[in-house]
């Protein structure tokens, strides 16, 4: 029964990938088996945005055009992108028509569009963008359109270059998320039980693997009826965040631009052993019938933490707005007590320009507008208002979330474990998920991290060698 719940959760999280694998805050409602073109929703009453007094340098003038976007959400109305779109539309005379599909449909739809000569002009970055899709020559290099020395890209060249393919830059992420996944908890229940607030522990530099483990134990032990559980959530992403806290990514980009596997690294092994301890001691588990995106265990105070993408926090914020007695909050994954620094997973989000696009120059200007929504003081303030209206964050939530957008203040770990071919990426997801949670997989049931890794390492290394051979 746990397998069924977790597998359903894995499906749910993959369908929400446009929300939680990138910028983390998008309100996508698309699924893998449905699609729609455009939208009839008019959100001007709910979220009016004015950019008339803002002046930006997002690039030289371009010919007005209607750009085609293929992805998971309406980028003309999403709270964190709408101000950038309005500026782009009003000052460059361009519009964007959105074809909204589920994340699992993007590769198929993009392949069909390119082969038929009807390439869109913008497409979402996804887990399989690099290196899988990039290696298929399905994107347009943006080096001639983008100025990496422009102020909005200051300090980001090292991260942009992590996604170079054969010496060319196809991807200029406009959103950089240190700690794209958080541990959400019911702060009100923690206070009732008498537990230390994890946010305060984090602020004091005391939020470590050990203090998290101690907190979970105390949370579970506080219920004499045995109805409280510990950690649940997005299985593989939660496991990856713990591994990345050692400072060692599972798959990284070497100085020569080639992929490097760290699955056999001693620090990765140590993190995996820590996760197996959490699992074996019952500190990481799913309640019966619960999947990763379920919020009921946190709302009812029956689970200590939910490891989930930033996107889910908005749902908790909206509950708090309706009932001011509720108090939910979140912290990043804890620090590895043996690491020399506090290391955080980092994810990026942005758009790529598909091969065959007729409006690559206009698309590049829009990407610049999106990045400026994070760096230009006026557009950033307008974007904050837009986000607050659409997401309903408290001021405390917003300020804490935004603190993780400035990657230069953190020791960020760039990790790309899911960008290989579909089969290998799923193997990695399964191994990570089964290391931290008992998923009752026929293939991995009862196996240790070492056993699962050794059984999979040949497949993983073969794929890495394949991609490196293309470079």
Predicted regions and their residues:
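C-terminal motif of bacterial Sec signal peptides marking the signal peptidase cleavage site
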Residues: 14-17
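Extracytoplasmic/periplasmic substrate-recognition and gating elements
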Residues: 96, 320-387
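Extracytoplasmic "Venus flytrap"/periplasmic binding protein-like
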Residues: 86-156, 169, 192-193, 297, ...
